[in-house]
């Protein structure tokens, strides 16, 4: 499932993990199942550690705008190496300067970083229902790969 790459340096060896196609499919299937279980019409986006889109599915009935918001939330979580809710909370707490961050456009809850051993492998972004429910769907997808 998770691909491992070993990097050799002069002193240390570091393992890095990446999402493979099977991981992306497993995340998508589990996230979709969670959404369908609650009859939630959402879009689910999965990105790699650089925020590049690996998978997108817009479920029946999901608003067209969700196909833009879900990848933006995932991108924000991957690039920030933390859930997008952290940025939303900072802004709501008065740190308005984050609104001008150049590459972070999805600073709303619903983007969940995929972390393994302190390394960000990517993120899942969901849009279409309440933001807490978006995050619930994303976490259900990530749980499918044991993280």
Question: Locations of the language-model features?
Answer:
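Flexible, solvent-exposed loop/hinge segments and secondary-structure transition points
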Residues: 10-147
């Amino acid at each position: 499932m998770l691909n491992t790459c070993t990097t050799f340096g002069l002193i240390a060896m570091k393992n890095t993990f990446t999402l493979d196609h099977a991981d992306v499919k497993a995340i998508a299937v589990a996230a979709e199942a969670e959404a369908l279980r609650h009859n939630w019409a959402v879009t689910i986006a999965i990105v790699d550690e650089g925020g590049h889109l690996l998978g997108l599915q817009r479920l029946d009935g999901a608003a067209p705008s969700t196909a833009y918001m879900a990848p933006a939330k995932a991108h924000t979580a991957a690039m920030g190496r933390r859930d997008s809710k952290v940025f939303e909370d900072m802004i709501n707490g008065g740190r308005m300067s984050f609104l001008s961050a150049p590459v972070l456009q999805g600073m709303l809850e619903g983007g969940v970083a995929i972390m393994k051993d302190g390394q960000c492998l990517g993120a899942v972004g969901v849009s279409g229902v309440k933001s807490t429910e978006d995050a619930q769907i994303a976490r259900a997808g990530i749980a499918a790969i044991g993280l």
